């Protein structure tokens, strides 16, 4: 174990904490990428089952992860028909009157991803 003089203790502690924070950030970024990729695949699968049709809507689901100096954020979205997701998930009005029932295919996946992400972040902190 290295001996640190008392006048340099604050520098040593700061250095250790910066390394620890860097390790956590790296681990959380990896978890975010993994969860986003898993989520896009899960929404594709649930959209095929819930919506049917030609498959264009289901195949359009993708994810994107952005990393800045202070944060890593992930987004799962439909690149081919982005406006359709809300209408299919929640239902919509018909031209001649009446409503079309929603087909929830995003919300169940979202709930599972939130649980997986929280668990992944906890593991990322524990392993750092």
Task: Describe every region a protein language model picked out.
Residues 1-79, 90-128:
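Short, Lys/Arg-rich flexible segments
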Residues 86:
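Aromatic/pi-system hotspot detector in well-structured domains
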């Amino acid at each position: 174990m290295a001996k640190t003089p008392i006048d340099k203790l604050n520098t040593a502690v700061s250095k250790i904490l910066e390394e620890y924070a860097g390790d956590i950030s790296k681990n959380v970024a990896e978890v975010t990428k993994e969860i986003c990729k898993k989520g896009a695949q899960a929404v594709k699968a649930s959209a095929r089952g819930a919506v049917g049709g030609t498959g264009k809507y289901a195949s359009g689901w993708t994810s994107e992860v952005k990393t800045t100096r202070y944060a890593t954020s992930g987004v799962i979205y439909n690149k081919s028909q982005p406006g359709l997701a809300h209408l299919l998930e929640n239902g919509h009005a018909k031209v001649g009157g009446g409503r079309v029932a929603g087909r929830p295919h995003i919300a169940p996946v979202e709930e599972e991803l939130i649980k997986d992400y929280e668990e992944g972040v906890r593991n990322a902190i524990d392993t750092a």
